[in-house]
C-alpha cells in the first residue's frame, strides 16, 4: 500500500523552500522606500557614469557560442560521476557513455559546420 506520510518531509521542505523567497520579496517590497527618478533609472557600472547608450545589443553569434559552451559544460557534469565510479560499473555503462559522447561530438561537428564557433 502506498503511504503518503512517507513523503511528509519532502512536502514540508517544498513548502518551506517556496515560502521563504516569497516572504523575502514581500517584506522587501513593503519596507523599501519608493523613489523613482533619473538617478534610479540610469544604469550603474562600477561607480562610473554611463557614457552614451547603456544598452548594447549582442550579436546572435555570441548566444550560439554561449549555448555550445553550456552544452559541453553540462556534459562534464554528467560524465564526472560516471568517471568516478568507472571501476564499479560494467561494460554496458561504458558503451552508454560512449554513445553519449559520440552524440555530443556529432553536435559539435554540426555547430562547427554551421559556423557557430566562428567569432568574426
Curated annotation (Swiss-Prot):
The protein's name in its UniProt record: NAD(P)H-quinone oxidoreductase subunit 3, chloroplastic
Subunit structure: NDH is composed of at least 16 different subunits, 5 of which are encoded in the nucleus.
Gene3D superfamilies: NADH:ubiquinone/plastoquinone oxidoreductase, chain 3
Any one GO biological process: photosynthesis, light reaction
Assigned GO CC terms: chloroplast thylakoid membrane; NADH dehydrogenase complex
Signal sequence range: none
Matches recorded under Pfam families: Oxidored_q4 (PF00507)
Membrane-spanning ranges: 9-29, 64-84, 88-108
Keywords: Chloroplast, Membrane, NAD, NADP, Plastid, Plastoquinone, Quinone, Thylakoid, Translocase, Transmembrane, Transmembrane helix, Transport
Gene, per the UniProt record: ndhC
Family: Belongs to the complex I subunit 3 family.
InterPro entries according to UniProt: NAD(P)H_OxRDtase_bac/plastid, NADH_UbQ/plastoQ_OxRdtase_su3, NDAH_ubi_oxred_su3_sf
Species name: Eucalyptus globulus subsp. globulus (Tasmanian blue gum)
Job description of the protein: NDH shuttles electrons from NAD(P)H:plastoquinone, via FMN and iron-sulfur (Fe-S) centers, to quinones in the photosynthetic chain and possibly in a chloroplast respiratory chain. The immediate electron acceptor for the enzyme in this species is believed to be plastoquinone. Couples the redox reaction to proton translocation, and thus conserves the redox energy in a proton gradient.
Source domain of life: Eukaryota
Main location (coarse class): plastid
Membrane topology qualifier: Multi-pass membrane protein
Location of this chain's protein in the cell: Plastid, Chloroplast thylakoid membrane
Documented EC number(s): 7.1.1.-
Top-tier EC class: translocase
Record field: catalytic activity: a plastoquinone + NADH + (n+1) H(+)(in) = a plastoquinol + NAD(+) + n H(+)(out); a plastoquinone + NADPH + (n+1) H(+)(in) = a plastoquinol + NADP(+) + n H(+)(out)
GO molecular function: NADH dehydrogenase (ubiquinone) activity; quinone binding
Taxonomic placement: Eukaryota, Viridiplantae, Streptophyta, Embryophyta, Tracheophyta
Amino acid at each position: 500500500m502506498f503511504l503518503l506520510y512517507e513523503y511528509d518531509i519532502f512536502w514540508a521542505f517544498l513548502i518551506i523552500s517556496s515560502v521563504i523567497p516569497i516572504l523575502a520579496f514581500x517584506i522587501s517590497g513593503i519596507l523599501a522606500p519608493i523613489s523613482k527618478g533619473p538617478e534610479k533609472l540610469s544604469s550603474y557600472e562600477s561607480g562610473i557614469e554611463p557614457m552614451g547608450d547603456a544598452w548594447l545589443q549582442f550579436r546572435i553569434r555570441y548566444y550560439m557560442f554561449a549555448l555550445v559552451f553550456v552544452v559541453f559544460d553540462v556534459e562534464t557534469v554528467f560524465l564526472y560521476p560516471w568517471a568516478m565510479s568507472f571501476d564499479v560499473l560494467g561494460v554496458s555503462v561504458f558503451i552508454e557513455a560512449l554513445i553519449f559522447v559520440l552524440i555530443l561530438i556529432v553536435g559539435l561537428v554540426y555547430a562547427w559546420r554551421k559556423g557557430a564557433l566562428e567569432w568574426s
